[in-house]
Every structure is written in C-alpha cells, then in structure tokens.
C-alpha cells in the first residue's frame, strides 16, 4: 500500500523549528515510520540535497498536494490533510462545505498500531462535488511554485527561442529534420540547460580571499629560491630597480661640475639655473668690455640688436600666453603690448623686439619721444618698424588708458642718466606705474637708488648684472658671443643655456 503513494507531491510541516518541506514522495517505510521526498523545497527554496527523509515524530502536518494518475497528473483541491503523531500515521481527505477548500484538522487515533494510508483508488472512488469557483482555486501551492520556477527558468533562457515564446505551453516542440539539427539541439541543451542541482546561495568573496594572500611572503620566497639557484632575480616589492630614461646614458659619467663660469674679479651676486649651474654676475664695466670685444670680432651692433629682439620677443610671446593665446581662434582677442623706448641703444633693442612682436600678429604701440637727432641704430630700427602694423606715438596722451597685456620697458640707460629728469621720462614712468599691466625690462641697468618702473621680469644679455629686487625675476638670453671672446676678457665660460636661448635665473 505504501507503494501506491510513490510519486505524489506532498507538503510536510515539521513545526517552527524545522519549517515546511514540499517534494515528491520517493519512499515510505512503515516499519521505521519514515517518509522520503526527492527534489525537496524548504520554505519555498530549493534544497541543495536531492532527497530528505522525515520521521513520524517530527511531522506536525502533512498535505497531499498532487496524486499522479495513469492518464496524467490529476490536480486535487487544497484540502488533503494528514496528521502523523508519535503513535501512528493517519490520513483524512475531505472538502469543506463552503467550497473554499480549507484544511480540516482532526486528531489521530491513540492506538499504538500504525494505521495505513488509504489507497489512491479509494480516494478516486469518492464522489466529490466541486464548484467552478473551486476549480479556479484548485491549484496547489507546489503547482504555483513550480510554475513560477519554470517561468524564472524560461526567463533565463534566450528570448529569441521559438519554443519559449510562440508555441503553446502544452504543445511539443517540432522536431527538425536531419542529423545536424538534432546535434544542434543537444548542444543547445548542454549550453542553456537548467539541470543544476546545487546553486550556491552566497557570492564569492573576492576581497576576503585576496586578503588571505600574502604577496610579500610569496615574493620573498621566490627571490630566495632564485638567489639560491643562481637565476636572475625579478626583485621584491620593497626593491626599486634603477631605471633610465631613453635619452640617458647607462654608463657612469664624471662628477658634475656646477661652477663652469668664473670671472676674474670678485662676484657681488651669483645666480643658478634650473639644472643647478652657477652663473656669476659681472659689473657694468666688464659687461661693456665684453660687448666691445665681441663687436671687434664681428658681432656688430646690428647683429646684437637682432638677437636681442628675437630673444626678447620669444620671451614676451610666452608671457602673453604662447599658443593658447596666439592661435587662429583668438584673432578677435589680439594681445596688446606697449613699448616704452628711450633715444639710445637700449631703446633700439626695444624697437627690434616690437618689430618681431608685430610680425607675430601682436598689436604693438611704440612710445618714442621726438628728438632732433637720432642714433643711426634707432633710425634703422624705426624704418623697419614702420613697415609693420605697429603704431608709433610720441606723446603719452596717445597711449591707451585701459590696461594693456604687457609693458616692455627700455627707457633706462646708465650712460644717459640725465634723461630721468626729462618731463616725458617722468610722465612715462607714471603711466607705467598707473597701468595695471605687468612690466618686462630689457637689459636694465643697476640703479644705485631704486627708482623708475618696477618690473616683474628682467632680461639680461650674455651675463647678468647684479640686479636688485626691483628687477623682478631675472632671465638670461644668449646673444651669440663666442667662448673665446669670454676668455679674451678673462672669463672662463661654458654655456649654461643647453637647448634654449632664454633661461630663468634664481638667486643662489
């Protein structure tokens, strides 16, 4: 008789401690009073084990949810109820009169002899009147759970499958002709099948497992093994191997000499470059002698003016913003530069710088006072400047009242100190100090008494003068004086410029 209930789907309530199990009956042992379920569900969740066994003493309530028949599975109502007590196993099947299919509990017999579960033929022979409402509510909990599980499985399947979208649920899948189609179906089942018995409930803890791995110990063990075996060591995490740039020589070089320039007289002030090279300052007399000897060897005033103008214009273009400011997209925002030049050689250097700036699409306004007689160098530079789009003015009233982008100061000359008392000079200094634009001084002299225009940057030629704080940040430009010319005036010289023509200097 126990074999008649094999294959039935039941629900077993084992109390609050063990919970509720559902599954298909796989074995019933009347001697040991046990029942086994295959593919069980515990509280609605599929168990990881394929089969579970229950003792009669642990079962509080047993429901028969489905009894298989010879023609297929027959669905019964929700009211198949069985109680298993410590003394025996009993079963009572019935439907309530109101047609809702509620469960009716009755205590089991107190007899010590085990009672057999009635045959399924007896249950079939009972005449049970089921209303249409009962037929709509006749699906059991396991049926609904199995349907939801099958729907979730079909959701995980590929959505472009014809079998899961277009055919009727009870319709068989049409077979494809040919051996190849059968092989493809087998491969699809192997790839997309859901016959997974055990699904882990928790995700893999990557961080926790990574923390268990001691990298330092493993690398140390590898390094020890390689040192013992004589193989090349790949290093340990605490070691930082020496790395060389693509342009760096891996061979050891001679010690670096930072003091490559020496002057014959005492140095009042020293500077250093970004690479650490020491650049001493020279007095105005030494600097004047150096330029005179260079001019005697062919570095004429015209060449010096051209080199000074190129280097000064390059520095000015960088200060104006470089390629970020001077590009075709900013044609409507041309930078404006005001040049303040005196009637001397230093003023001619400023005019040369203004010409190069005007050639680079910079709006240049040149101030130069009117004099009856001008130097030849100034006349030549003015002739070239007039061929550009730059503007030349001789009155301070013609200078812009709004702040410009940059002011270049070339008013001062140590040989023409008397010019500082001129009204135009004082007016130009006052205009530059009132204007909020930064000031660049080209080849400024050393003032015993600080006066005039305070510069933000100063550009020295060849070697710097001992400039004070009023000169701002000092830059040095290469005007093309050969090394032997330095040696001729008693200066041991080695170029500190490297690949540049203008370099910054820092106070040593």
UniProtKB/Swiss-Prot annotation:
Cellular compartments annotated: Cytoplasm, P-body
GO BP field: deadenylation-independent decapping of nuclear-transcribed mRNA; P-body assembly
Record's keyword terms, sorted: Cytoplasm, Phosphoprotein, RNA-binding
Domain YjeF N-terminal: 283-487
Sm domain: residues covered: 1-68
Pfam families: Edc3_linker, FDF, LSM14, YjeF_N
Gene3D superfamilies named in the record: 2.30.30.100, YjeF N-terminal domain (3.40.50.10260)
Domain DFDF per the UniProt entry, residue ranges: 192-228
Region (Disordered): 95-192
Annotated stretches, region: Required for P-body targeting and interaction with DCP1A: 1-79
Gene Ontology terms for molecular function: mRNA binding
Predominant location category: cytoplasm
Post-translational modification Phosphoserine, affected residues: 131, 138, 140, 161
Start and end residues of each stretch annotated as Required for interaction with DDX6: 191-296
Keyword presence, Iron: no
Coiled-coil regions listed in the entry: none
Keyword Signal among record annotations: no
InterPro entries linked to this entry: DFDF, FDF_dom, Lsm14-like_N, Lsm16_N, Sm, YjeF_N_dom, YjeF_N_dom_sf
A GO-annotated cellular component: P-body
Record's comment describing the protein's domains: The DFDF domain is unstructured by itself. It assumes a helical fold upon interaction with DDX6.
Assembly description: Homodimer (via YjeF N-terminal domain). Forms a complex with DCP1A, DCP2, DDX6 and EDC4/HEDLS, within this complex directly interacts with DCP1A and DDX6. Interacts with ZFP36.
Described purpose of this protein according to its UniProt entry: Binds single-stranded RNA. Involved in the process of mRNA degradation and in the positive regulation of mRNA decapping.
Assigned protein family: Belongs to the EDC3 family.
Name of the protein described by the UniProt record: Enhancer of mRNA-decapping protein 3
Organism listed in the record: Macaca fascicularis (Crab-eating macaque)
């Amino acid at each position: 008789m126990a074999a008649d209930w094999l294959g039935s789907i039941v629900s077993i309530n084992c109390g609050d401690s063990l919970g509720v199990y559902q599954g298909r009956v796989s074995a019933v042992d009347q001697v040991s009073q046990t029942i086994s379920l295959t593919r069980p569900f515990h509280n609605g969740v599929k168990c990881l084990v394929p089969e579970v066994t229950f003792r009669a003493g642990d079962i509080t309530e047993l429901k028969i949810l489905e009894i298989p028949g010879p023609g297929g599975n027959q669905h019964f109502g929700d009211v198949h109820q069985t109680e298993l007590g410590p003394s025996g196993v009993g079963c009572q099947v019935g439907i309530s009169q109101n047609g809702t299919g509620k469960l009716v509990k009755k205590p089991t017999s107190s007899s010590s002899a085990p009672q057999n579960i009635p045959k399924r033929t007896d249950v079939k022979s009972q005449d049970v009147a089921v209303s249409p409402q009962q037929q709509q509510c006749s699906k059991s909990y396991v049926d609904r759970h199995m349907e939801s599980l099958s729907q979730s499985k079909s959701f995980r399947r590929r959505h472009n499958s014809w079998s899961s979208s277009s055919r009727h649920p009870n319709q068989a899948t049409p077979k494809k002709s040919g051996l190849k189609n059968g092989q493809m179906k087998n491969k699809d089942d192997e790839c997309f099948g859901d016959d997974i018995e055990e699904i882990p409930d928790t995700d893999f803890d990557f961080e926790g497992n990574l923390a268990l791995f001691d990298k330092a110990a493993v690398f140390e063990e590898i390094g020890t093994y390689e040192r013992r075996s004589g193989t090349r060591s790949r290093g340990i995490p605490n070691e930082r191997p020496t790395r060389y740039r693509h342009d760096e020589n891996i061979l050891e070089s001679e010690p670096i000499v930072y003091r490559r320039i020496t002057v014959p007289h005492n140095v009042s002030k020293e500077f250093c470059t970004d690479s650490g090279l020491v650049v001493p300052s020279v007095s105005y007399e030494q600097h004047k002698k150096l330029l005179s000897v260079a001019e005697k060897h062919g570095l004429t005033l015209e060449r010096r003016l051209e080199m000074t103008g190129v280097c000064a214009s390059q520095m000015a273009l960088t200060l104006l913003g470089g390629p970020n400011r001077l590009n075709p997209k900013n044609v409507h925002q041309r930078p404006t530069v005001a040049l303040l030049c005196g009637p001397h050689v230093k003023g001619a250097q400023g005019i040369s710088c203004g010409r190069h700036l005007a050639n680079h699409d910079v709006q240049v306004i040149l101030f130069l006072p009117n004099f009856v007689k001008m130097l030849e160098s100034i006349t030549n530079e003015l002739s070239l400047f007039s061929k550009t789009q730059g503007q030349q003015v001789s009155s301070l009233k013609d200078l812009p009242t709004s702040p410009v982008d940059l002011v270049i100061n070339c008013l001062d000359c140590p040989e023409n100190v008397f010019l500082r008392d001129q009204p135009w000079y004082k007016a130009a200094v006052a205009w530059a100090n009132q204007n909020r634009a930064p000031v660049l001084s080209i080849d400024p002299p050393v003032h015993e008494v600080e006066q005039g225009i305070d510069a933000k940057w100063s550009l020295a030629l060849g070697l710097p003068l001992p400039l004070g704080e009023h000169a701002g940040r000092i830059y040095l430009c290469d005007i093309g004086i050969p090394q032997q010319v330095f040696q001729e005036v008693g200066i041991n010289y080695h170029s500190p410029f490297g690949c540049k023509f203008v370099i910054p200097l820092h106070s040593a």
